[in-house]
């Protein structure tokens, strides 16, 4: 089909090129999706999956809302998993932490599979069925509750590096009492001890017999008569 006459000049070439049809933008299936939904779905998807993969089929508002709710739970589980670094956990608690981490990862895998199945249109989840799945949401999951208890126990352990600062701040006194002035006491006067008698002297005194009284009287009378 020949081009319109205005696309050619007298020299046979249009300096501005041939006229093109106006570009018509394709419709965005997520035009009615709130920005919060977009962000949660982007964060809640499994590694290697983007939002475009989820909405490759024109999802309805109901499916998008269900995908958003599942993404919120996936993000909560991811946040809990980031809190636990096995290198900073005491050796006695590492096995328990590993068990709980495996439980959380299995729950997250179920959430991811449900999101992808909704995206490709393989399944249609009823609201009541989705609610039964969301009843084990991240905030009330048994595994997460056990993890919270374990985190509290580890925080009270002074041997943990990242808990030492918390325990130090809790051990500091909140108020300082005024110091009372010290009372000085005068030393009490002590009497000198009596000198101890030599045991040989005391034995000598005890060996001298007492003088009889009759001899003393005779001596007195003889002295008077001589005078």
Swiss-Prot record:
Keyword Phosphoprotein: yes
Region Disordered, residue ranges: 183-227
UniProtKB keywords: Host cytoplasm, Host Golgi apparatus, Lipoprotein, Palmitate, Phosphoprotein, Virion, Virion tegument
Lipidation (S-palmitoyl cysteine): 11
Reported modifications of this chain: Phosphorylated. Palmitoylation is necessary for Golgi localization.
Comp. bias intervals (Polar residues): 213-227
Localization: Virion tegument; Host cytoplasm; Host Golgi apparatus
Keyword Plastid appears in the UniProt entry: no
GO CC terms of this entry: host cell Golgi apparatus; viral tegument
Superkingdom classification of source: Viruses
Annotated function: Plays several roles during the time course of infection, including egress of virus particles from the perinuclear space and secondary envelopment of cytoplasmic capsids that bud into specific trans-Golgi network (TGN)-derived membranes.
Family per similarity comment: Belongs to the herpesviridae UL51 family.
Assembly, per entry: Oligomerizes. Interacts with ORF42; this interaction mediates ORF42 incorporation to virions. Interacts with vBCL2.
Protein name: Tegument protein ORF55
Protein's gene: ORF55
